Amino acid sequence: MALDKTTVAKIATLARLDIEEDRMEALAGELSGILDWIEQLAEVDTSGVAAMTSVADLALAWREDAVTDGGYADRVLANAPESQDGCFLVPKVVE
C-alpha cells in the first residue's frame, strides 16, 4: 500500500504530530513499507492455529478458596498508637 505526502500529513494531524515538510516523503516510504509487511502477515493461513492471548503458555496455580483473617492483625496493630478490640483507636473529630 503506497502512501503519499498528503496521507502522511493527515495521519500526522490526527496523531497531533508536527512533522516538517521535508520529512514527509521519507515517512511516506517508511509507512508504506510497514503497511506492506502487515499485508503480508494478513495473507498467512492461520486456520489451523489455536487462538492465544499470550506467547507464553502460563497457568496459575490454583489454591483452595478459604476465608482467613490473614494472620497480620497483631503486626498491623503494633504500628498503631492506640488500639482496642482489634481495631485502630483514633481521636474523636466530630462532636
Curated annotation (Swiss-Prot):
Entry EC number(s): 6.3.5.-
SUPFAM superfamilies linked: Glu-tRNAGln amidotransferase C subunit
GO molecular function per UniProt: asparaginyl-tRNA synthase (glutamine-hydrolyzing) activity; ATP binding; glutaminyl-tRNA synthase (glutamine-hydrolyzing) activity
Catalytic activity: L-glutamyl-tRNA(Gln) + L-glutamine + ATP + H2O = L-glutaminyl-tRNA(Gln) + L-glutamate + ADP + phosphate + H(+); L-aspartyl-tRNA(Asn) + L-glutamine + ATP + H2O = L-asparaginyl-tRNA(Asn) + L-glutamate + ADP + phosphate + 2 H(+)
Top-level taxon of origin: Bacteria
UniProt cross-references to InterPro entries, sorted A to Z: Asp/Glu-ADT_sf_sub_c, GatC
Gene3D superfamilies, per the entry: Glu-tRNAGln amidotransferase C subunit, N-terminal domain (1.10.20.60)
Biological process terms in GO annotation: glutaminyl-tRNAGln biosynthesis via transamidation; regulation of translational fidelity; translation
Keywords annotated in UniProt: ATP-binding, Ligase, Nucleotide-binding, Protein biosynthesis
Oligomer status and interactors: Heterotrimer of A, B and C subunits.
Entry-linked NCBIfam families: gatC
Stated role: Allows the formation of correctly charged Asn-tRNA(Asn) or Gln-tRNA(Gln) through the transamidation of misacylated Asp-tRNA(Asn) or Glu-tRNA(Gln) in organisms which lack either or both of asparaginyl-tRNA or glutaminyl-tRNA synthetases. The reaction takes place in the presence of glutamine and ATP through an activated phospho-Asp-tRNA(Asn) or phospho-Glu-tRNA(Gln).
HAMAP family on file: GatC
Family in the record: Belongs to the GatC family.
Protein name (record): Aspartyl/glutamyl-tRNA(Asn/Gln) amidotransferase subunit C
Species in which this protein is naturally found: Rhodospirillum rubrum (strain ATCC 11170 / ATH 1.1.1 / DSM 467 / LMG 4362 / NCIMB 8255 / S1)
